């Protein structure tokens, strides 16, 4: 999980 917009397409906060 990544809650940082820098993760780009890997962004998945709470999913």
UniProtKB/Swiss-Prot annotation:
Keywords: Acetylcholine receptor inhibiting toxin, Amidation, Disulfide bond, Ion channel impairing toxin, Neurotoxin, Postsynaptic neurotoxin, Secreted, Toxin. GO terms for cellular component: extracellular region; host cell postsynaptic membrane. Disulfide bonds join 2-7, 3-13. It comes from the Eukaryota. It is found in: Secreted. Coiled coil: none annotated. Expressed by the venom duct. Belongs to the conotoxin A superfamily. The cysteine framework is I (CC-C-C). Alpha3/5 pattern. This is Alpha-conotoxin GIA.
């Amino acid at each position: 999980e990544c809650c940082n917009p820098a993760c780009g397409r890997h962004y998945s906060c709470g999913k």
